[in-house]
A protein has these predicted regions:
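Rossmann-fold dinucleotide-binding core
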Residues: 1-52
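An accessory alpha-helical subdomain
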Residues: 55-171
Length: 171
């Protein structure tokens, strides 16, 4: 945008879908561009309506959206496609399910309530997203190979490695 428009520029990415009816507690990622003070009225308005402003560079935004959006969409898209291929009776499975399964199916259901063009665009928007999805698929394949080999030790090692990484974060 900066090279195509000489005036004020700001990157604004609402982190919610079109069905949200209120800005309250919703996140807006803001990437400063040029003459940022020009947009202070807009950011203040979002804050007044209860929105949360998170500032980052465009580079950080793009790098993290690979994981926040693209790989998550692919993972849930894959699970939805698998459930459809397997013709799982979702109503019956939900009767027999854990709370975690219910939450996951709810998330998958929300994904498939969206516009398919938007979902696909989110996954294919950049080469970095496509490459990350390929790496995720490679991880799935590597772990599936351990399952196929009934390699308990290998699976536990993979679990503990991920567990150690994730446990270092305080949410």
């Amino acid at each position: 945008m900066l090279e195509y428009h000489q005036g004020p520029v700001i990157g604004l990415h609402p982190m919610f879908g079109p069905k949200v009816e209120s800005f309250s507690e919703q996140k807006f990622v803001v990437c400063p561009g040029r003459n940022d003070e020009t947009f202070e009225w807009l950011l203040n308005w979002i804050r007044i309506l209860g929105g949360n402003i998170i500032v980052c560079t465009p580079e950080e935004h793009d790098r993290l959206m690979v994981f926040v959006q693209a790989t998550q969409h692919f993972s849930r898209f894959s699970l939805g496609a698998f459930v459809a291929e397997e013709e799982v009776d979702l109503n019956r499975s939900l009767l027999l399910s854990t709370p975690n399964y219910q939450q996951e199916i709810d998330i998958v259901k929300r994904l498939f309530a969206q516009n398919p063009q938007l979902c696909v665009e989110i996954m294919l928007a950049t080469e970095e997203r496509c490459q990350a999805i390929a790496r995720l698929a490679s991880t799935y394949n590597r772990l599936a190979q351990l399952v196929a080999q009934k390699d308990r030790f290998g699976l536990i090692q993979e679990f503990e490695k991920a567990q150690e990484f994730i446990s270092n974060f305080r949410f």
